[in-house]
Amino acid sequence: MKKILYLFLALASYGISAQTTAEEYLNSAVSKFYLNDMKGAIVDYTKAIKIDTNYIEAYRKRGLAKETLKDYSGAIVDYTKAIEIDPNCAPAYRDRGIAKGKLKDHSGVVEDYTRAIEIDPNYATAYFNRGVSKFYLGDMIGACKDARKAQALGDDASILIKKACN
């Protein structure tokens, strides 16, 4: 009877140690991403998410892999999920704004960057990117204000300033 108990405990502990964690899948996915294996990265990000359904970083990084494959709508779904988990994650709004920009949804870009700026008022990149979308929407005054604010925060917004502020 003791042998059976030891065997059971040994098998149970092997099963526990053999389980891959969400972080391990994330690390594997990041490696695949940098090796330009986007499909493999997406598979591993998905495995990380199955283990931890609130893993914001996995959603954001999977979105980036989808974006790299030009699956902008799929990327937006992942970024939106990250935002649902943490509505104050400014980088997730930035990520989603970039994907919306690739789909020429400049109004959506402005909304996302406005929210990112509400969360982090010193987010220079958000001001710059929002300014670019305002430029495409024909709002030169808004584009110029955002470009000047981005520049004041350290972003090189000189090209946008030349186009929007003259």
Positions of predicted regions on the chain:
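Alpha-helical tetratricopeptide repeat
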Residues: 2-166
